[in-house]
C-alpha cells in the first residue's frame, strides 16, 4: 500500500488521528482522537481532486444526497475531538462520518451528489455555534458582533437602549414581548426572550410565558425578593421554562440563605455567580455548591488580570443607573468588586464547578468576547494549575472539552433547547463555526447558520479573487431576504406555541420549543458538574472549595489579544 508522510497528508487532507494542534497562541494543544474518514478514499473538492462526476460525486437526485458537505474537518465538541466529514440536509446536521460516492467507494455514510455544495474543511477546526444566555437586547447590532465571534444563539431580554434594558435582561409584559419578537424575527441569529419574573402573584408571569417568552428573569433592580423567587419558580415548574436570577446584592429582601430557602431545591440558573455582576454580596459565590443551581459567569471578570478590578467600578455605575455623587450608590458598586472572589472564579471554572459562560452584553460584558475569554481562562489555568486529570504532556483534550461545553451544550441544556442547538450532532441545526487553528477562538473563518454562510471575512469586492485586502467580516446570504427565516430560530415555551403566538404575530423564523429544562440539575452540566462545599471568609473574601483556598495570581499577559487586533 502506498504511504505518504504525516506532514504531506496533513497538508493535503488535514491532520489525522494522533496529530496535535495548538489553539491560537495559547498553551492549549488538542490531539485528534479518531478519524472517521477512510485512508485512500478521502474526498476533496478542486481541480484534479476527488469530488467529480463518477468519482467522489454520485448520480443521485437531491433527495438522496446532502445539500452541504464540510470535508475533512476537525470537530471540537463536548463528546470528542475527531476528524470527519459533516453532512447537512435541510439546514440540519444529518451525518458525521465518511462522505463520498457509494457506487465506487467503501464505508460511505454521507452521499455526495450533483445537489451537494462543498465547504473545504481541510485543516480547519469546527465548533458548534455558541449559546450566550445573558444578552441585554440594547441594540440590534449586537447580533452581527456576536455572530462574527462565533455565537449563533442569543438568550436574554430587553427593548433597546433604555434604563430597564441597560440594567436587566427583561422584556416585560405582553406588548413589549410581542414587539420584540416581531423585531428579532429579522435578525439572522437564534433568539429567546426572558419575561419579567419579579412579581409575587402568578398571573402576570403566566401571561408573559403565553406571550412567547423562553423563560423568566429575576433581577434585583426589579426586586429579587424571596416571595418573587418562590412565585416565579412555581410558575416555571408549572409551564416548563427556566428561571435566571441576579440576586439581591444589598441583601435588602434577605440574605443568601433566604434566597436558597425560597428556591427550595428547584432548578435555577444563577448569573455572574462570582458576584461582580451582581448578587448577594459577598455570598453569592456559595451557590456554586448547590446541586440544583446552574452557575454561570459573565465575561468582564474572565479571566482575572491586573486590570480587571480597576475597570469594573465605572462599568457598574453606568450599567445600574447609579450616581457617583451619592455615597450609597458608590458603596453599592464597591461592594460587588472583590479581587479574591474574582480570582476564585477562574479556578472554579477549571475545576468544572461553574458550568456556563456568557457575556452580559453592553451591561458590563462584551458580546463579542464570550468565546475568546473562555479560552483565555483555560490557557491561564493551564499555566497556573498544570494539566487537568486525564490530560498528558501531549494534549489538553479534557480541558478543551470542559471549556467548550461552557458556551455550547451547557447553556443549551440549561434553557431547554439542547435538542436544537449547542453541539455538532445529528438532527441539530447546522449552526457551525469554522476556524483556522492559528485564529481559533478569535476570528472565525466562516460562520454558518442553518447550513448557510451567514458571515465571513471577505476582501475587496472589486478584486479579481476574494482575498485581497481590505479584508473584514461581511454579512452573507443567510442574512438576506427570506433565507434568514429558514436558517434562524426563535425559541419559546410550549404555552406560547400552543397559544398561537407565531401565527398571531406573523413570525417567519423557525420556531423552537423549550422542553425539559425543569429536570436539568448541576449533574446535567457536561464536564462541569462538580459540586464542591463552598466557604467564604466574610472579612478577607477568601473562597474555599472542599476546604482548599482558591487563590491565583492575576494574569499580566494573555493570548488571543493584541497580536490579533493590530488592524
From Swiss-Prot:
Post-translational modification comment from the UniProt entry: Carboxylation allows a single lysine to coordinate two nickel ions.
InterPro entries linked to this entry: Amidohydro-rel (IPR006680), Metal-dep_hydrolase_composite (IPR011059), Metal_Hydrolase (IPR032466), Urease_alpha_N_dom (IPR011612), Urease_alpha_subunit (IPR050112), Urease_AS (IPR017950), Urease_asu (IPR005848), Urease_asu_c (IPR017951)
Pfam families noted in UniProt: Amidohydro_1 (PF01979), Urease_alpha (PF00449)
Keyword set includes Nucleus: no
Enzyme class: hydrolase
Positions of Ni(2+) 1 binding: 134, 136, 217, 360
Catalysis: reaction(s): urea + 2 H2O + H(+) = hydrogencarbonate + 2 NH4(+)
Lineage start: Bacteria, Pseudomonadati, Pseudomonadota, Gammaproteobacteria, Enterobacterales
Record SUPFAM superfamilies: Composite domain of metallo-dependent hydrolases, Metallo-dependent hydrolases
Keywords for this protein: Cytoplasm, Hydrolase, Metal-binding, Nickel
Note on cofactor: Binds 2 nickel ions per subunit.
Biological process annotations from GO: urea catabolic process
Name of the protein this chain belongs to: Urease subunit alpha
Domain Urease residue range list: 129-567
GO cellular component annotations of the record: cytoplasm
Binding site residues for substrate: 219
Pathway it works in: Nitrogen metabolism; urea degradation; CO(2) and NH(3) from urea (urease route): step 1/1
N6-carboxylysine, modified sites: 217
Cofactor(s) for this UniProt protein: Ni cation
Gene3D superfamilies: Metal-dependent hydrolases (3.20.20.140), Urease, subunit C, domain 1 (2.30.40.10)
EC number in record: 3.5.1.5
Subcellular location: Cytoplasm
